[in-house]
């Protein structure tokens, strides 16, 4: 579903789903605003956002890219991960829209 503001990745059976893996963290603001708008208009009942858990950084610090650089440089603190999402949920940027936040951690990597 597309709004005048932002695309949601998937919409099915009144559930909006978005996967944010390594985008700039402002993407969460757009996702939450879109889900909030859809919820307020009665188009969805819940939003689901999947992102990285903080403990995945332990793996990224050890893994190297093709140039021998630590992957943590690519997956830094300004990109999407659970800590950036929870801050926004605690600030109620989702309005009244229920959000299921899922963090993919190192045990799932």
Predicted regions: what they are:
Residues 1-13, 26-33, 40:
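Active-site metal-binding core of divalent-cation-utilizing nuclease and nuclease-like domains
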Residues 2, 29, 42-58, 67:
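Class I S-adenosyl-L-methionine-dependent methyltransferase catalytic core
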Residues 11-18, 47:
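Glycine-rich, often proline-containing surface loops adjacent to acidic residues and nearby aromatics
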Residues 15, 22, 40, 52:
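Residue-level marker of positions within ordered structural domains that often coincide
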Residues 18-27, 56:
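Short beta-strand-loop-alpha-helix junction that forms the active-site gateway
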Residues 21, 32-47, 90-95, 101, ...:
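Catalytic core segments in nucleotide and nucleic-acid processing enzymes
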Residues 24, 28, 40, 71, ...:
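Short capping loops/turns at secondary-structure boundaries
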Residues 54-109:
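Domain-level recognition of nuclease-like catalytic cores that cleave nucleotide substrates
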């Amino acid at each position: 579903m597309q709004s005048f503001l932002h695309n949601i990745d998937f919409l099915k059976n009144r559930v909006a789903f978005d996967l944010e893996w390594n985008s700039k963290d402002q993407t969460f603001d757009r996702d939450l605003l879109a889900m909030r708008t859809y919820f307020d208009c009665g188009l969805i009942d819940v939003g689901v956002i999947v992102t990285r858990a903080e403990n995945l950084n332990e793996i990224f610090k050890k893994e190297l890219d093709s140039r021998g650089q630590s992957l943590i440089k690519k997956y830094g603190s300004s990109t999407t991960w659970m800590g950036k999402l929870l801050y926004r949920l605690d600030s109620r940027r989702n309005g009244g829209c229920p959000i299921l936040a899922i963090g993919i951690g190192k045990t799932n990597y």
